[in-house]
């Protein structure tokens, strides 16, 4: 596998799309099954030799591992992934430009109808990658910062413009915040990360947000940057800035992350595998059958103290039955390896491994892809 970057590299990424690619062409291959690492997960190799997918930048770093595991499980097969945002991932999948799409939000009603026309069968939303959204900031004098939903909403809609605003200071009584102007950085591209973050602001701000949600940033203030890589780089290089990033990008850029005060009470919550795992454990499925859309409202206003509330699930948007069975076979094999051996080590790279109880439900759906 070869990792290509467009634009100048900063840390893990810089501006532009991340492309995961490997040698080979689009010839079809046949093959038997391979047994890979975690829980001796069965991978039914075969079908299209080189898959193509695009979408969510939040899962870009996880895809690096998933492609490596797929190549090991199914020699001669690979996947090219372009991290160009959830909106592009859905659009390119529905336009039959890719074999599946990655999105941090499930298909809308209209998008699902377009996907069914493209597939000739219902499309499924399969949540495969879980990751917290970090609120990151650049204040040299502040190494630990507490924020809550109402205060974040007022920062990101421009109601609070100074770091020493009384609302922020009240959450951080142990030190005096600087009288520095806040510089908001947001995603300029259509983004599932933005949609999830705005859904959190809407749910957790007690009405302070007032801007709605959606893949485009609605706050009306700040500076836009493309992709998780772009917002990470902008925050790192802008004193007084604040933004939202998928956790793995915040880690890679060594950004300082805020602790979040939640509706469950207790101490402000930092991102850890345990704090996010508690949140995922409370999720329910609102989709029907093998369409595993999650009801994430419980994420944003947790009832259990110690649960980190800003969590996104990245869905792989797939055809339940592909017009070309060779594609369906390969997509199924890729996802089998992803939810099997691909889960090992994710926690070291800013992602949360799929809980065992949910993995069995996901495996049933993946194995049904044709």
From Swiss-Prot:
Coiled coil: none annotated. A lipid is attached at residue 23 (S-diacylglycerol cysteine). It is a lipid-anchor. Residues 1-22 form the signal peptide. Functions in inorganic phosphate uptake, is probably the main carrier for phosphate uptake, it is the most highly expressed of the 3 PstS proteins under phosphate starvation. Binds phosphate; probably able to bind both H(2)PO(4)(-) and HPO(4)(2-). Part of the ABC transporter complex PstSACB involved in phosphate import. Probably plays a role in host phagosome maturation arrest. It is found in: Cell membrane. Phosphate binds at residues 56-58, 86, 104, 191-193. Keywords: Cell membrane, Lipoprotein, Membrane, Palmitate, Phosphate transport, Signal, Stress response, Transport. It comes from Mycobacterium tuberculosis (strain ATCC 25618 / H37Rv). It comes from the Bacteria. GO terms for biological process: biological process involved in interaction with host; cell division; cellular response to phosphate starvation; phosphate ion transmembrane transport; symbiont-mediated suppression of host innate immune response. GO terms for molecular function: phosphate ion binding. PROSITE patterns: PROKAR_LIPOPROTEIN. One of its GO terms (cellular component) is plasma membrane. Disulfide bonds: none annotated. Its main location: membrane. Disruption phenotype: Grows normally in liquid culture, traffics into host (human and mouse) acidified compartments early after phagocytosis, suggesting it no longer arrests phagosome maturation as well as wild-type, impaired growth in mouse macrophages. No growth phenotype in phosphate-rich medium (3.6 mM Pi), nor in restricted medium (Sauton), but in phosphate-free Sauton medium dies faster than wild-type when pre-exposed to complete starvation. This is Phosphate-binding protein PstS 3. A lipid is attached at residue 23 (N-palmitoyl cysteine). Induction: Transcription induced 6-fold by phosphate starvation, protein levels increase after 24 hours starvation (at protein level). Part of the pstS3-pstC2-pstA1 operon. The keyword Lipoprotein applies. Belongs to the PstS family.
